[in-house]
């Protein structure tokens, strides 16, 4: 009888465990993207300026426009002066009630002195929200020693995907702590959710973003500061190499709006309902299946990239 009751107890625990994770999975999709209402970001931020790194292209540019729409003054940090000027012009033409500033900064090869100068410039304004968006992707997936561009590119991807998010957070947090309000959103990638062969450095660098965000959230959770990671899957941008939208590949404007609507409701999410469904479904499969899926996807991506390069060469 005791053995029977023990077996029943173990069975009940297993069922409850499975039920808990099932409800958690459903809620991470429906609760976050259907039932929760967006918070007033500007009110929660406690200051009028939003800083966006890599804000002249793709997701970063769409974040800049969406935050301007929500009443923030916009401070863009990016590399190319002409793109910064053009983006500023476009935002101010559409949202004349906001102020737009920019700082020209190359995140691939800065010194600590360069970062100190940048942070001094940024801290001249009251920053309510920081979006650490700047990132770099390899030309196509490949074994580490075969990376196009060699160790220079490997170094750039590693540095650009980890250092800016760390140093800008460290440099801007003091004014948020003093106000006891502020929002930091760190843009990672679904690539950080699994050990991805042929994406090793990129995947590892995006896992760093997740881990750092989680640690910072614990450090500052009682100081009125929201710190959240957004880990998207495929978005139609120049960086991703995909320009056509689909059910699981939204345009950057759609993604940015959806992602910002999740801020304040969770510690980490993909930012888009269909991406969240993808991730929750993939999490149900064993690692060997994911490895096979990643391998197939990597081969297809590499073949497309090489074919595109060959076509350009022929032209």
From Swiss-Prot:
One example GO MF annotation: oxidoreductase activity
Any single GO CC term annotated in Swiss-Prot or TrEMBL for this entry: endoplasmic reticulum
UniProt keyword Iron, yes or no: no
Alphabetized PROSITE patterns for the sequence: ADH_SHORT
CDD domains the record matches: 17beta-HSD1_like_SDR_c
Catalytic-site annotation from UniProt: 202
Top enzyme category: oxidoreductase
E.C. code: 1.1.1.-
Sites where the protein binds NADP(+): 47-76
The UniProt record lists the keyword Oxidoreductase: yes
InterPro entries noted in UniProt: NAD(P)-bd_dom_sf, Sc_DH/Rdtase_CS, SDR_fam
GO biological process: fatty acid elongation; steroid biosynthetic process
Annotated keywords: Lipid biosynthesis, Lipid metabolism, NADP, Oxidoreductase, Steroid biosynthesis
Similarity comment: family membership: Belongs to the short-chain dehydrogenases/reductases (SDR) family. 17-beta-HSD 3 subfamily.
This protein's name: Putative steroid dehydrogenase 3
Organism from which the protein derives: Caenorhabditis elegans
